[in-house]
UniProtKB/Swiss-Prot annotation:
Superkingdom of the organism of origin: Bacteria
Protein species of origin: Lacticaseibacillus paracasei (strain ATCC 334 / BCRC 17002 / CCUG 31169 / CIP 107868 / KCTC 3260 / NRRL B-441)
Family the UniProt entry places it in: Belongs to the bacterial ribosomal protein bL32 family.
Listed PANTHER family: 50S RIBOSOMAL PROTEIN L32, LARGE RIBOSOMAL SUBUNIT PROTEIN BL32
Any one of the GO CC terms: large ribosomal subunit
Record SUPFAM superfamilies: Zn-binding ribosomal proteins
Descriptive protein name: Large ribosomal subunit protein bL32
Gene giving rise to this polypeptide: rpmF
The keyword Ribonucleoprotein belongs to this UniProt entry's keyword annotation: yes
Annotated keywords: Ribonucleoprotein, Ribosomal protein
One Gene Ontology term of the molecular function aspect: structural constituent of ribosome
Length: 63
């Protein structure tokens, strides 16, 4: 059975676990829509760098 030869110190344990963390998304305030969006991504309303680049289609009109 595999058993550690020596006890792992607090420093070694913490160094190993140093990269285990949650990543916070980089949010930017979009002045065109007044909402927050992820950097370098189109906002949910279709705006990028203050200009509308994607026109939202109205799915309810076809129903």
């Amino acid at each position: 059975m595999a058993v550690p030869a020596r006890r792992t110190s607090k420093t070694k344990k913490r160094m190993r676990r140093g990269h285990i963390k949650l990543n916070v998304p980089n949010l930017q305030f979009d002045a065109a829509t007044g909402e927050y969006r992820i950097s370098h991504h189109v906002s949910p309303k279709g705006y990028y760098k203050g200009a509308q680049v994607v026109k939202k289609s109205d799915d309810n009109a076809n129903a």
